[in-house]
Amino acid sequence: MAGDSDNVSLPKATVQKMISEILDQDLMFTKDAREIIINSGIEFIMILSSMASEMADNEAKKTIAPEHVIKALEELEYNEFIPFLEEILLNFKGSQKVKETRDSKFKKSGLSEEELLRQQEELFRQSRSRLHHNSVSDPVKSEDSS
């Protein structure tokens, strides 16, 4: 697996930012230390994804699901990460439901994107017309009420 990591990397700026946020302000780290962290992260990701793939294969699944990753973490004895990751998964699923609801609202309308755009443009036109009409008629109303 270590040989495979020559072809992939983690974004150095992202890793640098993560390390900087974790370290005390008075601590520094070298580029070599950052490279070791990057390579360790890559190796961890490769091991975890390989184990999760194995878990999916054992269930005759062709897609790795979050449950497979969690089982892989258990198998690798990283149980302390699981509650945190399950919370992240719940938050992600919640945000996906909101997105799906928004997306399905337009799909359920039965209208094409072009038709929806045309309706939106018409609503804008009507709104501008009302705004223009109100701004023209308001001075007259204020003169009448004097």
UniProtKB/Swiss-Prot annotation:
It comes from the Eukaryota. Keywords: Activator, Nucleus, Phosphoprotein, Repressor, Transcription, Transcription regulation. GO terms for molecular function: chromatin binding; core promoter sequence-specific DNA binding; protein heterodimerization activity; RNA polymerase II general transcription initiation factor activity; transcription corepressor activity. The keyword Phosphoprotein applies. The modification Phosphoserine is found at residues 135, 137, 142. Residues 124-146 are annotated as: Disordered. GO terms for cellular component: negative cofactor 2 complex; nucleus. GO terms for biological process: cellular response to heat; negative regulation of RNA polymerase II transcription preinitiation complex assembly; negative regulation of transcription by RNA polymerase II; negative regulation of transcription by RNA polymerase III; positive regulation of transcription by RNA polymerase II; regulation of RNA polymerase II transcription preinitiation complex assembly; RNA polymerase II preinitiation complex assembly. Component of the NC2 complex which represses RNA polymerase II transcription through binding to SPT15/TBP and thereby inhibiting the assembly of the preinitiation complex. The NC2 complex may also mediate transcriptional activation from TATA-driven promoters through association with SPT15/TBP. PANTHER family: PROTEIN DR1 (PTHR46138:SF1). Present with 2950 molecules/cell in log phase SD medium. Component of the NC2 (negative cofactor 2) complex composed of BUR6 and NCB2. The NC2 complex associates with SPT15/TBP. Interacts with SPT15/TBP. This is Negative cofactor 2 complex subunit beta. The lineage of its organism: Eukaryota, Fungi, Dikarya, Ascomycota, Saccharomycotina. The gene is NCB2.
